[in-house]
Amino acid sequence: MTVTKTAAYETLTESSAAALAVRLGLFPSKSTLTCREIGDGNLNLVFRVYDKEQQRGLVIKQAVPYAKVVGESWPLTLDRARIESSALIRQAEHVPHLVPKVYYSDTELAVTVLEDLSHLEIARNGLIDGKDYPHLSEDIGEFLGKTHFYSSEYALDPTVKERLVKQFTNPDLCDITESLVFTDPFFDHETNDFEEELRDEAEVLWGNEALKIEAAKLKQRFLSAEETLIHGDLHTGSIFAGEDGETKIIDPEFAFFGPIGFDIGQFIANLLLNALSREENRRAPLYRHVETVWNTFSRTFSEAWENDAVETCKHENGRLESVLRQAFEDAAGFAGCEMIRRTIGLAHVADLDTIVPFSRRISQKKLALKIGAAFIEKRSGFRTPKDMIEAFRNALKE
């Protein structure tokens, strides 16, 4: 695709980001500000602007017209900034305590100005350091239960949902997910990235036609099931957390109307990838998170259904159970795709890539591929999170 920048668009620098904050009236004109680029993501520029005298800061996030992880050879739409700010505002209608405040957004500059969350840390980093965040999965379950229900056909008038589907149409970023999660890792594709010691396992996976058919079915669900407004990229790097129990979900630029089970599947996959990086005696908190996130999501979604479902749904016996059953099966399959993608595809996770020694890193990555394939192929047999955990632990013993 070709990205067209508007006449107003210019890439921010540390000095121009600070000037923008003053121009918007977010700091007094005579403030002495410091501004530092803090982004380490694949797609955007992120600046923290701070007034030491007032001890107050904010974050300015700007989309750039290409994928930073690849370079200008991979152009991307700037409209993802609008998607992100709109998603955060909608999520805040239901879980304001779990998302950052949006102070300002500008579609021409592709800028979103956000609450400063520097008192928290990225959950992935904390989990790698051995922190457990006991409230993390309960918060994510509540976030998903409420945001997924209240943006679904079970809560919305059909015309409202149709309008939202159009508002959050996000073809470029959906194409990234389709390629990097559901397609490329299952073939010998140039975007794949892995150690040569994993080639034998990768080639076995590429030759598994039954697995590839199941992955294609999951891709079809991802592309066609316009069930609710999903976050679209809910891994542990998209979550800020604090040991005092505070949680904030960030970066919903991949948001669009997709299957209910996708977000929870991605979150579970990243929990289990972290579990692979730990010794067995340190994995119990991750197993608890897997159970808690599903149980909290299911309970929250069910309570919202009982209170606020449209009348037609309330009179359909078994409909809620069917929706949750499909979401759980999908979540298991999507988790499997995510585990495989994060092991041999583009954009790895530090949970695996920082394992030492190298020999253990390779052995754990081989397990990630094996577990991912099992989750995809056996997803219809999973009934509870305990089934996922049992499959995970059994793979470790084999």
From Swiss-Prot:
GO terms for biological process: L-methionine salvage from methylthioadenosine. The keyword Transferase applies. Keywords: Amino-acid biosynthesis, ATP-binding, Kinase, Methionine biosynthesis, Nucleotide-binding, Transferase. Its EC number is 2.7.1.100. InterPro entries: Aminoglycoside_PTrfase, Kinase-like_dom_sf, Methylthioribose_kinase. GO terms for molecular function: ATP binding; S-methyl-5-thioribose kinase activity. Substrate binds at residues 233, 341. Pathway: Amino-acid biosynthesis; L-methionine biosynthesis via salvage pathway; S-methyl-5-thio-alpha-D-ribose 1-phosphate from S-methyl-5'-thioadenosine (hydrolase route): step 2/2. ATP binds at residues 44, 61, 115-117, 251-253. SUPFAM superfamilies: Protein kinase-like (PK-like). It catalyses: 5-(methylsulfanyl)-D-ribose + ATP = 5-(methylsulfanyl)-alpha-D-ribose 1-phosphate + ADP + H(+). Catalyzes the phosphorylation of methylthioribose into methylthioribose-1-phosphate. Belongs to the methylthioribose kinase family. Homodimer. This is Methylthioribose kinase. The gene is mtnK.
